[in-house]
Amino acid sequence: VDYLERTYAAGKIPGGFFRREGRPTEKAIITSRLIDRPIRPLFPKDLRNDVAINLLVLSVDNDNSPEIAAMLGASIALSISDIPWNGPIGGVSVGMVDGEYILCPTAEQREHSTLELTVAGTEKKVVMIEAGAKEVSDDEMFDAIMLAHEEIKKLCAFIAGIQTEIGKPKFEYTPSEIDAELYDKIKEFCLEDIRSAYSTDDKN
């Protein structure tokens, strides 16, 4: 996933002689990872085709964050394409101001929020959670996740409707098969060494 924010999306032009965009910002890189995490596990495990998702922010205000819209755009694009994928997914951000949950809070609301939660998932399960908070209880966090998932179900149903209306048939591919005999030999040769490497507390 490649998420790009251009300054012209906010009505600005870069300064300097060349007036070109620089490398992706840290926020753009983190957003790319945020969108990639819930999407990646839903591809068939034996699919070996390279899939690139490019998300370009064309216009945005300074009050609403474009990350969730980009995640939904990626979900819709994959759903209506011919790429095999076990979506759709939906994504929601949740804040909490004065003890009240707020879905997709604005920039001003986020400044006063004691919870910053992003949830992504399918109609049946939550796939990804990213959260930061100023001391919220376990029950409050659980309720926020459940609230987010209820909204995600609605978004998934909406995207499924789009897929039904304009989606392409998924292409057929030849599954990648693992040589069982070779797998067993590799497992016998190095499994214990791998386990030892993962469990060691030696930093050298």
Language model: regions and residue ranges:
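Short intrinsically disordered coil segments
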Residues: 16-18, 69-71, 108
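Generic, ordered loop/turn and secondary-structure boundary motif
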Residues: 2, 9, 14, 18-19, ...
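Glycine-rich, flexible beta-strand/loop modules in the N-terminal catalytic cores of phosphate-handling
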Residues: 1-51, 57, 64, 123, ...
